[in-house]
Curated annotation (Swiss-Prot):
Any one GO biological process: dUTP biosynthetic process
Catalytic residue positions: 135 (proton donor/acceptor)
Entry protein name: dCTP deaminase
Pfam families, per the entry: DCD
Coiled-coil stretches: none
Its biological purpose: Catalyzes the deamination of dCTP to dUTP.
Self-association state and partner proteins as the record states: Homotrimer.
The organism of origin for this protein: Helicobacter acinonychis (strain Sheeba)
Positions contributing to dCTP binding: 109-114, 154, 168, 178
EC number(s) given by UniProt: 3.5.4.13
InterPro entries to which the protein is assigned, alphabetical: dCTP_deaminase, dUTPase-like_sf, dUTPase_trimeric
Family statement: Belongs to the dCTP deaminase family.
Gene that encodes it: dcd
NCBIfam families: dCTP_deam (TIGR02274)
Top enzyme category: hydrolase
Amino acid sequence: MGLKADSWIKKMSLEHGMISPFCEKQVGKNVISYGLSSYGYDIRVGGEFMLFDNKNALIDPKNFDPNNATKIDACKEGYFILPANAFALAHTIEYFKMPKDTLAICLGKSTYARCGIIVNVTPFEPEFEGYITIEISNTTNLPAKVYANEGIAQVVFLQGDEVCEQSYKDRGGKYQGQVGITLPKILK
């Protein structure tokens, strides 16, 4: 299994639509950086957030109640205020179409981590297609800004030694083709 370089990421994105929209260079002046890097791609967070703000609720991943969260549009302000010790969901600006022989892993950016903002994203499985739902936690006792339309995490691509027998698409993955923020799902 090999870590893929910028030239491979660029080729797969421009010729096969792996990342769209695709930024061929790293943009980093006066913004939290995004775009192509040496061995990865820095993704951007969109302007829509879902804040988990019902203090009297129980979060149950097997029976999620959407009333436990509030949608917030941060496009006008350009940022979202994540309250102290709070959790929110968001989604990427980029749409992904993963190759069948490749898995991607996403790691939060150090700029946010150094401010106590932790970003979690599960792996992008072979042949997954869709926007990425991003989990964002504020681990501090202070409110924190998360900037819309700027970098939030870095994706690294690992190509398998052989093609998997069954991809995410083949299995009918429950988040296949997701658009916007996608809440937890359990197949029944």
